[in-house]
């Protein structure tokens, strides 16, 4: 394990990974133990997938793995499905309106898992399958940071969560301050909504253009 991880700055995994099989779960746990022993920052996207395992199975595994996590990404049903923490009532048309419940859920993660130093989430008000408002929120060092709200007409609603996570990690490893990190992450996420297929084929400059634009109504 060491030969694969010893030169890494961060280790990123999602809830999809240990759900694949018991062997993969054990491999992830082994990697996380190595990271903890060698001061490698661990970032976890809870990313619950009900077709892969039940909430009960997810909670047993993910609550155990959380002892190794430094930074947590939790969206929508992830809080309750993987950790048993209530933060979202299941209505995607009012996600942003539930921001106080999200904040409390994020705080509860840090209370139950004190090794987790920061938590971030994507909040959405979805009005139709294609039309919605999107924003990011980031809790770190005892303070919440919120991105602007972006109104988006989606071309394809696939991969936006992964785009958010990737851009969030990009911000962390490149030393962005917390506000810039969450603004960059949500900008990458909404940009992905205007691109077909899974891969967010954009540059940092593309994301900055969205991030620095005063126009928060996006469509392509």
State where each predicted segment sits.
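Ribokinase/PfkB-type carbohydrate-kinase core domain
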Residues: 1-144, 150-151, 203-209, 218-220
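Conserved post-catalytic alpha-helical subdomain immediately downstream of the catalytic base
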Residues: 144-213, 218
């Amino acid at each position: 394990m060491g030969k694969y991880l010893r030169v890494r700055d961060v280790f990123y995994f999602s809830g999809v990974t240990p759900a694949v099989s018991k062997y993969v779960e054990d491999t992830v746990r082994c990697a996380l133990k190595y990271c903890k022993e060698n001061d490698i920052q661990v970032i976890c996207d809870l990313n619950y997938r009900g077709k892969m395992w039940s909430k009960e199975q997810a909670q047993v595994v993910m609550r155990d793995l959380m002892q190794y996590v430094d930074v947590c990404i939790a969206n929508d049903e992830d809080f309750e499905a993987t950790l048993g923490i209530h933060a979202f009532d299941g209505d995607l048309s009012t996600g942003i309106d539930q921001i106080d419940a999200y904040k409390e859920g994020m705080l509860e993660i840090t209370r139950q898992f004190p090794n987790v130093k920061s938590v971030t989430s994507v909040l959405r008000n979805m009005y139709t399958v294609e039309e919605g408002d999107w924003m990011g929120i980031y809790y770190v060092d005892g303070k919440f940071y919120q991105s602007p709200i972006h109104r988006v007409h989606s071309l394809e609603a696939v991969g936006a969560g992964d785009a958010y996570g990737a851009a969030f990690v990009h911000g962390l490893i490149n030393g962005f301050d917390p506000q810039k990190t969450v603004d960059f992450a949500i900008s990458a996420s909404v940009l992905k909504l205007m691109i077909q297929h899974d891969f967010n084929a954009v540059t940092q400059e593309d994301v900055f253009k969205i991030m620095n634009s005063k126009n928060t109504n996006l469509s392509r």
